[in-house]
């Protein structure tokens, strides 16, 4: 490997036992800084391949640098910034390649600081180079820090419970906006240049935690992971994966960005604190990003000018041996690492290998926004490198694949159908009791086993075959079903009463059954068709039914006649007619004097006796002749003790009532 030109994505993890370096397969290749056991934050310089970090327990210095080239056995550590009386717990650290500045946050002082690293060590007091970018309120705890070098923004997290939020600010520290909704205790934060989003880890209530994301304007909140029983503190990203550190169990997790359920542990060991993906993200992978082009062009121009001696070469090792390096295909020599920074189309130690060289097997190679090669495949091929025919494995069940207008189609064998021959026409359970065969039209057909019938051989042949309690059996010689009838029936299905055999039915087809003459094999085959069962019209049962119906009808008519005769000769009850005669001297009921007659009427059914006649109910219950009824009525009219009487008027005058 030679500097930043290598496409391998190396990783760096800080632990309680030092700084560990890994290759792209997460195999440890080297380590350094073993004297530092409480590293709280660190940042990476891609141009000079230096690691900047802070150690909580060091009594004199707050920030150190370490040569991060994994090819070297010994990683030199340099003390950069001394501590002061105000120096507090450093929680976040980032590096800006354009201005070559370090930015960091301190929790105790509630401030964001910066320093130009190339000016340190030139005889100037390092403490005087530190600038205060901004201060936050005392009820804010600065935690994680991230930088968007392309768009020139800073992001930090505030983990104070009452005011917790995620902040976006300018490089000068001016707050632009923040995200506060449902933010509990955010910690590590990182910028994803590939998807233009911000990710941070956050402690939730109780044992819960989550990894959240927003866009670069800290809007459009999405939950990436939400789980329990872990304590994540730091997060980093590359083009495909998100990495997060769990200090509680000492693990580093790798989670697929496109599917958060796909995750694995890539490191387990001494308590990890932070992680950096050293993948030349800025210089190599973002050179085609429109938002990054102008910034990266300036960075590369500074590298070129420094290599050519136009700019002072700060912090260059004096013991380095000169080596002649020539970068091909307009590559830029980085004197700090003595390696080449290649254009997006080339790779190799000297930028000598076109990145698209033999990359696409059957297609055209193009360079994406992340400077990675991608393939535009020919019509009949697919895959990351167009190395797989669309017909490979497309047709199932021995189907033959062919192309029709660059679309893969399948010619299926006889027993299968579907776009990919995935559907079996004759499934194992299609014919219940038989063998399935495919007809010429592609439809399934069942050949039933002996003793079964139906479209899918679902019906036992003997089911409901023999009538009148006949017993169905299978003939072992002919393999046909036969009926063993009782004493009163005969026929193929025991459908003919034997008593009809003595009658002259005129049906010669029934005669062989009645006579007991065995049928020929041809007749037996014809009898496989179930005969239509018919019955004699003059049967005994029908005669009984008709006779019963006739008797019931006659009885009903007789009863109707008797009721009519009885009604005709029955004597009617007398009808009483009441007449009222009105004269001129008759006083109306409403105009009579106040003095009224008090009348006691016994057994009267209506109190208004002057208007309504009354009857003696006892007399009505007696059976008497018509003449006797009239006599009783006349007697009651004359007799004041009867059920009905005429009342004198209250005035005592003559009454003209009848």
Swiss-Prot record:
SUPFAM superfamilies: EGF/Laminin (SSF57196), YWTD domain (SSF63825). GO terms for cellular component: plasma membrane. LDL-receptor class B repeats lie at residues 100-142, 152-195, 196-241. It is found in: Cell membrane. Residues 1-543 are extracellular. Keywords: Cell membrane, Differentiation, Disulfide bond, EGF-like domain, Glycoprotein, Membrane, Oogenesis, Repeat, Signal, Spermatogenesis, Transmembrane, Transmembrane helix. InterPro entries: 6-blade_b-propeller_TolB-like, Cueball_EGF_LRP_Nidogen, EGF-like_dom, LDLR_classB_rpt. The chain crosses the membrane at residues 544-564. Has a role in spermatogenesis and oogenesis. This is Protein cueball. It comes from Culex quinquefasciatus (Southern house mosquito).
